[in-house]
Amino acid sequence: PYTTLTDPSMTFRAVTVSSYNDANNSFYENSGRGFLSNGLIKPDVAAPGVNVSTPVGKVTGGSMAAALTAGGVAQFMEWAVVRFNNTSAGSQEIKNYLIRGANRNSSNTYPNREWGYGRLDIDGTFAMLSQIQR
């Protein structure tokens, strides 16, 4: 049950995301999980992936968590590149910011095989960035 991640999530630079149910904060049982046999800690973060509202109705799956994470990365890239805060931000730096801003449950140990370094929290990432810039 702990070796369900596959390519391309197994690469070092990829932001790998697992899925959880945002309604009750439970891990989605069909989500991929790590750690990897090559020693990499994956997933990096977890994002909502159960009953996500879309124009065609509610959808469940890792693709929903990936899409929400991609949207968060797009917001970060606007802040970094478009607004000239960090025009050289690369994939590893973006991943590090997402990890540092992740929301962690005090009853869990991080990183772990289901949640990675915690739940994706873009607000938390930007709050952390505002502290760094002061």
Please give the residue ranges for each predicted region.
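Extracellular S/T/G-rich loop segment that most often corresponds to the catalytic His/Ser-adjacent loop
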Residues: 1-78
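Short, hydrophobic-biased amphipathic alpha-helical segments
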Residues: 118-125
